């Protein structure tokens, strides 16, 4: 017969009471009223914050964007096909953030920082908010170091500095992405981390860019963030902020970074789609009223850090596509007013075989000249003005039948200057090579040559100087100035080489 001992029972009850944990978890929940087109309307979620992540019953994550009196408008980070009306939603208490680490270098990721290159997970111990405030005035210093693109037309006449924001703008198929990718290729060995953000691009175009980076050995210092044309609007809207968060991680670790947004007008279209579906009032070109803020808060994150913060930098190169050269459209004017200058690419120049098709007359760099090395300033100082005058003169010369000798000479010089600015894709030039090239053209050494011979001669001259006059490169790279000694070396070498070249061409 079982005997019940009262003291044992009382001990068990006492233990249970001591172990009882009165922990209460409060979850902010709501119910799905309506779902479709990447948008969900939620009843409840009374204490949700603007921009807070919410989780649906079947696992989809969304962002609370519209906080209205009787419901919450949520944009979905997925297709939302499994979300049902009446299912529950809970607030997570978190704002969108991504993991960050050095391990992201060389990888292709999506807007949520998940790898999409099939090479396994990326380990990261830290995380950063996707949207973090831009550095304040005290945290910055003025731009003073050059970011060399390797493109002679840009580095000589529209220079970009580390920490600058320079817009690349032009019609479709004018080589905008090529300018940006060449800039990334030229950062090899320059200790610059590059982030390329593809927003709403064709998957084949992104694959082509990644292949170029891999072939040229640029992936080891590059991160590619890609949300292709078939991605949900929410992810296309988030992708640039994800790229900026990754670049900021390196900037605040005293590194130099360069970020390319290709292109923010696609992000604006995704944001317009989300806003219209959330029934926000449309404005000009049906964009919402805060589309300027969409881009300004993104591009203001590019900065040159102060010496107290380690002098890291983040250079932004947004790419904007225009429709038949119309730069007065809404998004182009917005981005032009936010950035520190713009590089215009012209379809007419591109079709005329001038590539990169940079329209030097209307391209500007508002702060880059402070970053240009002294040697380049000395040599290329007058080039931009000369080319602008040449373009004007060329237009005038079409109507004039007989031109005087001085005008003919100026036209011939201008044609040769324009010829030396032509450059094939993925063939960046060092600063020293650029200085030699411009000096040769600006001082009339190319005048005896036919226009078709210019490119061939310049290649020959650069090769000769590298092998026979290595001290020239050493002088420019060590002093950063174009000294009398450097000029004397060139004055000696160029006429010799021209004579030799002309003899070779005759035989």
Swiss-Prot record:
<dbReference type="InterPro" id="IPR000194">
    <property type="entry name" value="ATPase_F1/V1/A1_a/bsu_nucl-bd"/>
</dbReference>
<dbReference type="GO" id="GO:0043531">
    <property type="term" value="F:ADP binding"/>
</dbReference>
<dbReference type="InterPro" id="IPR036121">
    <property type="entry name" value="ATPase_F1/V1/A1_a/bsu_N_sf"/>
</dbReference>
<dbReference type="InterPro" id="IPR027417">
    <property type="entry name" value="P-loop_NTPase"/>
</dbReference>
<comment type="function">
    <text>Produces ATP from ADP in the presence of a proton gradient across the membrane. The alpha chain is a regulatory subunit.</text>
</comment>
<keyword id="KW-0139">CF(1)</keyword>
<keyword id="KW-0066">ATP synthesis</keyword>
<protein>
    <recommendedName>
        <fullName>ATP synthase subunit alpha, chloroplastic</fullName>
        <ecNumber>7.1.2.2</ecNumber>
    </recommendedName>
</protein>
<keyword id="KW-0813">Transport</keyword>
<dbReference type="Pfam" id="PF00306">
    <property type="entry name" value="ATP-synt_ab_C"/>
</dbReference>
<dbReference type="InterPro" id="IPR038376">
    <property type="entry name" value="ATP_synth_asu_C_sf"/>
</dbReference>
<dbReference type="Pfam" id="PF00006">
    <property type="entry name" value="ATP-synt_ab"/>
</dbReference>
<dbReference type="InterPro" id="IPR020003">
    <property type="entry name" value="ATPase_a/bsu_AS"/>
</dbReference>
<keyword id="KW-0547">Nucleotide-binding</keyword>
<dbReference type="GO" id="GO:0046933">
    <property type="term" value="F:proton-transporting ATP synthase activity, rotational mechanism"/>
</dbReference>
<comment type="similarity">
    <text>Belongs to the ATPase alpha/beta chains family.</text>
</comment>
<dbReference type="InterPro" id="IPR033732">
    <property type="entry name" value="ATP_synth_F1_a_nt-bd_dom"/>
</dbReference>
<keyword id="KW-0472">Membrane</keyword>
<dbReference type="InterPro" id="IPR023366">
    <property type="entry name" value="ATP_synth_asu-like_sf"/>
</dbReference>
<keyword id="KW-0375">Hydrogen ion transport</keyword>
<keyword id="KW-0067">ATP-binding</keyword>
<feature type="binding site">
    <location>
        <begin position="170"/>
        <end position="177"/>
    </location>
    <ligand>
        <name>ATP</name>
    </ligand>
</feature>
<dbReference type="Pfam" id="PF02874">
    <property type="entry name" value="ATP-synt_ab_N"/>
</dbReference>
<dbReference type="GO" id="GO:0005524">
    <property type="term" value="F:ATP binding"/>
</dbReference>
<keyword id="KW-0934">Plastid</keyword>
<keyword id="KW-0793">Thylakoid</keyword>
<comment type="subunit">
    <text>F-type ATPases have 2 components, CF(1) - the catalytic core - and CF(0) - the membrane proton channel. CF(1) has five subunits: alpha(3), beta(3), gamma(1), delta(1), epsilon(1). CF(0) has four main subunits: a, b, b' and c.</text>
</comment>
<dbReference type="InterPro" id="IPR000793">
    <property type="entry name" value="ATP_synth_asu_C"/>
</dbReference>
<keyword id="KW-0150">Chloroplast</keyword>
<keyword id="KW-1278">Translocase</keyword>
<dbReference type="InterPro" id="IPR005294">
    <property type="entry name" value="ATP_synth_F1_asu"/>
</dbReference>
<feature type="site" description="Required for activity">
    <location>
        <position position="363"/>
    </location>
</feature>
<keyword id="KW-0406">Ion transport</keyword>
<dbReference type="GO" id="GO:0009535">
    <property type="term" value="C:chloroplast thylakoid membrane"/>
</dbReference>
<dbReference type="InterPro" id="IPR004100">
    <property type="entry name" value="ATPase_F1/V1/A1_a/bsu_N"/>
</dbReference>
<dbReference type="GO" id="GO:0045259">
    <property type="term" value="C:proton-transporting ATP synthase complex"/>
</dbReference>
């Amino acid at each position: 017969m079982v005997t019940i001992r009262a003291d044992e029972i009382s001990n068990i009850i006492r233990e249970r009471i001591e172990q009882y944990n009165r922990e209460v978890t409060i979850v902010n929940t709501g119910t799905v009223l309506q779902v479709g087109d990447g948008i969900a309307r939620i009843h409840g979620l009374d204490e949700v914050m603007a921009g807070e992540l919410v989780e649906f019953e079947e696992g989809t994550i969304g962002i609370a964007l519209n906080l209205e009196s009787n419901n919450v408008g949520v944009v979905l980070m997925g297709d939302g096909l499994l979300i049902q009306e009446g299912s529950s939603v809970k607030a997570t208490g978190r704002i969108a953030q991504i993991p960050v680490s050095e391990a992201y270098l060389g990888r292709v990721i999506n807007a949520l920082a998940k790898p999409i290159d099939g090479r396994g997970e990326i380990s990261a111990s830290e995380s950063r908010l996707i949207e973090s405030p831009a550095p304040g005035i005290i945290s910055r210093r003025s731009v003073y170091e050059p970011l060399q693109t390797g493109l002679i037309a840009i580095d000589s006449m529209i220079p970009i500095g580390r920490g600058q924001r320079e817009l690349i703008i032009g019609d479709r198929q004018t080589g905008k992405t090529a300018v940006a990718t060449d800039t990334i290729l030229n950062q090899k060995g320059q200790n610059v981390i590059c982030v390329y953000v593809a927003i709403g691009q064709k998957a084949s175009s992104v694959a082509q860019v990644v292949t170029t980076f891999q072939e040229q050995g640029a992936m080891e210092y590059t991160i590619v963030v890609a949300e292709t044309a078939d991605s949900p609007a929410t992810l296309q809207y988030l992708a640039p902020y994800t790229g900026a968060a990754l670049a900021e991680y390196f900037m605040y670790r005293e590194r130099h970074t360069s970020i390319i947004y290709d292109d923010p007008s696609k992000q604006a279209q995704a944001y317009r789609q989300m806003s219209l579906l959330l029934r926000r009032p449309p404005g000009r070109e049906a964009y919402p009223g805060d589309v300027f803020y969409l881009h300004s808060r993104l591009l203001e994150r590019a900065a040159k850090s102060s010496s107290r913060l380690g002098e890291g930098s983040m250079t932004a190169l947004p790419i904007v596509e225009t429709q038949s050269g119309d730069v007065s459209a809404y998004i182009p004017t917005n981005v032009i007013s936010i950035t520190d200058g713009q590089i215009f690419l012209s379809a007419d120049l591109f079709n005329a075989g001038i590539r990169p098709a940079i329209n030097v007359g209307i391209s500007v760099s508002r702060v880059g000249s402070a970053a240009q090395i002294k040697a380049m300033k000395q040599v290329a100082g007058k080039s931009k003005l000369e080319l602008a005058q040449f373009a004007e003169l060329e237009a005038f010369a079409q109507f004039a039948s007989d031109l005087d000798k001085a005008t003919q000479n100026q036209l011939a010089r201008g044609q040769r200057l324009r010829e030396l600015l032509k450059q094939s894709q993925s063939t960046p030039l060092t600063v020293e090579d650029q200085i030699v090239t411009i000096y040769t053209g600006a001082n009339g050494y190319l005048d005896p040559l036919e226009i078709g011979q210019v490119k061939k001669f310049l290649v020959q001259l650069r090769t000769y100087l590298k092998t026979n006059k290595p001290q020239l490169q050493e002088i420019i790279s060590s002093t950063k100035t174009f000294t009398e000694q450097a000029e004397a070396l060139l004055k000696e070498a160029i006429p010799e080489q021209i004579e030799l070249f002309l003899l070779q061409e005759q035989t």
